[in-house]
A protein has these predicted regions:
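Conserved alpha-helix/loop element of class I SAM-dependent methyltransferases that forms part
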Residues: 5-21
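S-adenosyl-L-methionine-dependent methyltransferase catalytic module, highlighting the catalytic core
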Residues: 100-104, 111-171
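A short SAM/SAH-binding and catalytic strip from SAM-dependent methyltransferases
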Residues: 85-97
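Class I SAM-dependent methyltransferase SAM/SAH-binding core
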Residues: 33, 37-74
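Alpha-helix C-terminal capping/helix-to-coil transition sites in glycosyltransferase folds
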Residues: 20, 81-82, 108
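Residues at the starts of beta-strands that form the adenosine-phosphate
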Residues: 23, 45, 111
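Conserved class I S-adenosyl-L-methionine
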Residues: 22-30
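Short conserved loop adjoining the S-adenosyl-L-methionine
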Residues: 74-80
Length: 171
């Protein structure tokens, strides 16, 4: 089990925002690191969703509730307002129908928390300036094997939220 200090930086930020004893849906939960930490340290009731079989196995081995599903078709298995928080961490850039998933997140949850690789971050821009696609902790793939299909900045994401009548809250 990861201590708060060893959580990935974005997961640490997310964990800090989630109140104890909350209901959490973690979309694209990967190995379940966030959910496992939240259940152990904040007594949350959580469900993870991922499409990858190895991720599902890792979550099950940790004793987490997890569903293997493709989020691209929506979250129809969940009722409106089922969760206090819906998390989408480092996953949105690999999805085709971003507007649908954002709508669905806010349908099934009271609060949506989204993190993504910021391609406008100065270190990423510097790598592009010197002729290389960015590779970092949050963008660990080479250009030829990346699942990322959307490359956005915080301003781009804020503009998308504005189209949907939402705004960016950065605590």
């Amino acid at each position: 089990m990861a201590s708060h200090q060893t959580l990935r930086p974005d997961l640490k930020h997310i964990a800090d925002q989630i109140k104890p004893a909350s209901r959490v849906l973690d979309l694209g939960c990967a190995d379940g690191e966030l959910l496992a930490w939240l259940q152990s340290n904040k007594n949350v009731r959580g469900i993870g969703v991922d499409v990858d079989v190895l991720s599902i196995v890792s979550c099950v081995e940790k004793g987490l509730n997890v569903i293997q599903a493709d989020m691209e078709s929506g979250l129809q298995h969940f009722e409106d307002g089922s969760f206090d928080y819906v998390v989408l961490s480092l996953t949105i850039q690999a999805m085709h129908n971003i507007e649908l998933i954002l709508q669905e997140m806010l349908r099934v949850g009271k609060v949506g928390i989204v993190t993504f690789p910021n391609f406008g971050f100065w270190e990423n821009r510097l790598q592009i300036l010197i002729g290389r696609m960015p590779v970092s902790e949050t963008i660990p793939y080479e250009w030829y094997n990346t699942p990322n299909i959307h490359f956005c900045t915080v301003k781009d994401f804020d503009q998308l939220l504005g189209k949907t009548g939402r705004n960016l809250n950065d605590p």
